């Protein structure tokens, strides 16, 4: 099936990948050039893993996971395969985010810095916990086969909304963290005097913001939604489409065949009962 507005989609996709990749490169340059590199010794070099892993996993990889269903080259792949890829990318993002938080706690423990005192830390830890919860719920309800279709229809709009909300909150949290870090480390020259590190890192923040905007635009265009698989029917609640943005939750064709077989069986039984009654009536009149 051809995608409507394919050239526009391709242009935005390439732009998103380019900007996201540049964001990862910029955060690496920031910590390697301006912040003395990476390490795992409880010092500042260990803390530097925090922005690197947060931008790479929680921003870039999560953004790709959000739009993976919309890649038209994957529409011939099974829905289960795409669900597995979506879940796998989100799992990688969660693991990298967890490691980034561990690096911060180690750094604070070694330096005797209080934990969880800033708004950045409050929002960041909250969104990480909710992200892991979202991943676990999605795994058990959408990836594993035993959840009833009615439950999937109820949860899907919540899953889509909360996923986008968490992604937007992650971007806001990263921008808060970048600004907070610059205020802490830029003393001479100070942040407000436009030092090279400040200008460079502000550019990183703009790249992250643009990447998020491109992902939001791609995932909210209805004409770029993955089409339903042949032989499937959408589940609807109260007359509404229950699938949110990424295609209707569908009953498989095997289920449809089972339902059809059951209907034919019931019709056959009804015909037999009718013939039996007719036969009985004929016998009573003979």
Curated annotation (Swiss-Prot):
Source organism, top-level taxon: Eukaryota
A GO term from the CC aspect: brush border membrane
Tissue: Highly expressed in all regions of the small intestine and colon studied in suckling animals. However, after weaning, when iron absorption declines significantly, strong expression is retained only in the duodenum. Also expressed in respiratory epithelium.
Binding site for heme b 2: 70, 79, 86, 159, 225
Binding site for heme b 1: 50, 115-118, 120, 180
Phosphothreonine carried by residues: 285
GO biological process: ascorbate homeostasis; intracellular iron ion homeostasis; multicellular organismal-level iron ion homeostasis; response to iron ion
Positions annotated to bind Fe(3+): 108
Cytoplasmic topological segments: 1-7, 70-78, 145-151, 223-286
EC category: translocase
Subunit (UniProt): Homodimer.
Biological function: Plasma membrane reductase that uses cytoplasmic ascorbate as an electron donor to reduce extracellular Fe(3+) into Fe(2+). Probably functions in dietary iron absorption at the brush border of duodenal enterocytes by producing Fe(2+), the divalent form of iron that can be transported into enterocytes. It is also able to reduce extracellular monodehydro-L-ascorbate and may be involved in extracellular ascorbate regeneration by erythrocytes in blood. May also act as a ferrireductase in airway epithelial cells. May also function as a cupric transmembrane reductase.
Protein name: Plasma membrane ascorbate-dependent reductase CYBRD1
Species of provenance: Rattus norvegicus
Top-level taxonomy: Eukaryota, Metazoa, Chordata, Craniata, Vertebrata
